[in-house]
Regions:
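A detector of single, family-specific signature residues
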Residues: 1-242
Length: 242
């Protein structure tokens, strides 16, 4: 276990301040936009963890009433955070909601559901869902208590997804007002979600004197390892950034 270094660090900082008293740049508070962007991202991270937990909880419940129904749909989440499989199980919350219907009746009902929620209808998908429901073995009965458990889990997940979508939109709006936004968005692999997150974590990039300072701030620099004639170039990253 490493010894505590709080006092030693405080002395180091004090000595550094005394040595560079005349050359240290004046502290400038963070801009309101950057501060809000950073806090939005912090909340986004927290809600993302909650969403993962709630999604796992819902899938666990569905394994007892309609196993693997979430794997029948592969549509990407919408801009408002809604997902097709979540909307589907909100209506067809038990495998018997599908298996007790003839294929023709279920197809008609599924078509009506797709039109209501704005999803594409596929007869092959209707047949696949119906076949899956016919082969499912549910552990929990089809009653009001089971329906309450599933729909409450869905309601919590939808609320969290909506909050994430709102935060993402606000982060995008805040990031777009900053001067470095066009440069960040032109980077390879950076999209509408990652771009604002990078800007939130880095802050004002103009405060770094070089690209090496930015790399060290991110904690992905490889510190030197030299002693006498030894000079190791292959090093792991420090992970000691902000």
């Amino acid at each position: 276990r490493r010894a505590k270094t709080d006092k030693k660090d405080a002395v180091k900082l004090a000595n550094y301040g005394l040595d560079h008293w005349l050359t240290l740049p004046r502290y400038v508070p963070e801009e309101d936009t950057r501060l809000l962007l950073k806090n939005c991202y912090r909340q986004y991270q927290q809600y993302s963890k909650v969403q993962t937990m709630l999604k796992n909880n819902l899938i666990s419940l569905l394994d007892a009433v309609f196993p693997e129904v979430n794997r029948l749909f592969n549509s990407s989440p919408r801009a408002d955070g809604s997902e097709k499989w979540v909307d589907f199980v909100s209506t067809f919350w038990h495998c018997q909601c599908v298996s007790t219907l003839p294929l023709k009746s279920f197809s008609a009902r599924y078509l009506k559901w797709c039109r209501k929620h704005g999803y594409y209808f596929s007869q092959e998908k209707a047949f696949e869902i119906h076949s899956k429901a016919q082969s499912c073995i549910s552990v929990m009965p089809r009653n009001e208590t089971t329906k309450l458990l599933v729909q409450q889990a869905i309601a919590q997940l939808k609320a969290t997804a909506a909050a994430l979508a709102a935060l993402k939109q606000e982060m995008q709006s805040l990031a777009a007002s900053l001067p470095e936004y066009p440069v960040v968005m032109e980077m390879f692999g950076v999209g509408s979600t990652l771009g604002p997150q990078l800007m939130a974590e880095i802050g004002d990039v103009r405060r770094f004197h070089s690209k090496k300072a930015l790399v060290a701030f991110a904690g992905i620099d490889a510190p030197p390892c030299q002693s006498g004639q030894m000079d190791i170039h292959s090093r792991s990253i420090s992970k000691r950034g902000s």
